[in-house]
């Protein structure tokens, strides 16, 4: 039996999720608050819809971060999307999601990213084509094994009710996706990543997306609380800025969401919200052997946690 697709329930959940995550991150920071920029597409634009971009700046813990909700729709998919999925041609579509990136001030606190999204393409008289996607991943500068274990154990616990292989599959997908081939390293220590999820019933797929979205703060906040008061010097700060450069490289060169958004006339400020406020590059930099900075490379390969 075809399950009922409830777009409104998904949108309601995503708006609540944005509120909840912002509240939890504000409590963790203890100083700064998210400033909301609500936006709407102009009439006559290719895409309709709008969203709520929320940005935190110069907090006690977070140097900058953003939690974005968007819901956009159009009469037909861009050619770049239908080239790979011809069944989407001639269908009106809607895409909605919450995406976030948090860039902490303290180099001992990892950067984190999370995203959950829903896509549906509809045509009169035909069954809708829909899927869910999402995940979360962690990018430490000074990694701790116990933090990685907590992050991945939380991910395992989220996946367990949905099947014994889900964690392994979505963890491996995350390792493959957040990989910089020109640097031969992963962006961080991974987590979960999934896309095109529609093989279960709508209810089951939606439940998994909800679990991943709500699991992000369970995975991240305890690590932030543990590391946010660690003393650091200018050396660690400079290394953090250098490593943020890799984050920029991934987002601008490789990230499908960023590229799709910019190529299809998405809202540029919201798309580039994920960028760090400061980053640096240094020609042919190599950390000295035996230093904490050199240790990071051991973590930037897929591993079992």
Swiss-Prot record:
Active site: 113 (proton donor)
EC number: 1.3.3.3
Catalytic activity reported: coproporphyrinogen III + O2 + 2 H(+) = protoporphyrinogen IX + 2 CO2 + 2 H2O
Protein's UniProt keywords contain Transport: no
Protein name: Oxygen-dependent coproporphyrinogen-III oxidase
InterPro entries, sorted: Coprogen_oxidase_aer (IPR001260), Coprogen_oxidase_aer_sf (IPR036406), Coprogen_oxidase_CS (IPR018375)
Site positions for Important for dimerization: 182
Name of the top EC class for this enzyme: oxidoreductase
Cofactor or coenzyme needed: a divalent metal cation
Known role: Involved in the heme biosynthesis. Catalyzes the aerobic oxidative decarboxylation of propionate groups of rings A and B of coproporphyrinogen-III to yield the vinyl groups in protoporphyrinogen-IX.
Gene name of this polypeptide: hemF
Organism: Vibrio cholerae serotype O1 (strain ATCC 39315 / El Tor Inaba N16961)
Region (Important for dimerization): 247-282
GO cellular component: cytoplasm
Domain of life (superkingdom): Bacteria
Keyword Transcription regulation: no
Binding-site positions, a divalent metal cation: 103, 113, 152, 182
BP term (GO), one: protoporphyrinogen IX biosynthetic process
């Amino acid at each position: 039996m075809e399950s009922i697709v409830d777009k409104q329930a998904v949108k309601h959940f995503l708006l609540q999720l944005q509120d909840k995550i912002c509240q939890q991150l504000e409590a963790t920071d203890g100083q700064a608050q998210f400033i909301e920029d609500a936006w709407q597409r102009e009439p006559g634009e290719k895409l309709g819809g709008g969203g709520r971009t929320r940005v935190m700046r110069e907090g006690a813990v977070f140097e900058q971060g953003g939690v974005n909700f968007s819901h956009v729709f159009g009469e037909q998919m861009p050619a770049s999307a239908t080239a790979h999925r011809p069944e989407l041609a001639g269908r009106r579509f809607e895409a909605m999601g919450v995406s976030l990136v948090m860039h902490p001030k303290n180099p001992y606190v990892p950067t984190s990213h999370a995203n959950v999204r829903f896509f549906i393409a509809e045509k009169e008289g035909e069954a809708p084509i829909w899927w869910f996607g999402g995940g979360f991943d962690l990018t430490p500068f000074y990694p701790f094994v116990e933090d990685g274990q907590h992050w991945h154990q939380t991910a395992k616990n989220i996946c367990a009710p949905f099947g014994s292989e889900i964690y392994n599959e979505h963890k491996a997908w995350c390792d493959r996706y957040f990989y910089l081939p020109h640097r031969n390293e992963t962006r961080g220590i991974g987590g979960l990543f999934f896309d095109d999820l529609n093989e279960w019933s709508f209810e089951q797929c939606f439940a998994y997306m909800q679990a991943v979205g709500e699991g992000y703060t369970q995975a991240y906040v305890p690590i932030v609380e543990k590391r946010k008061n660690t003393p650091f010097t200018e050396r660690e700060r400079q290394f953090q800025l250098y490593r943020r450069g890799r984050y920029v490289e991934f987002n601008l060169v490789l990230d499908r969401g960023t590229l799709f958004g910019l190529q299809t006339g998405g809202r540029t400020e919201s798309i580039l919200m994920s960028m760090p406020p400061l980053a640096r590059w240094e020609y042919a930099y190599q950390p000295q052997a035996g230093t904490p900075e050199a240790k990071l490379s051991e973590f930037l390969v897929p591993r079992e946690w």
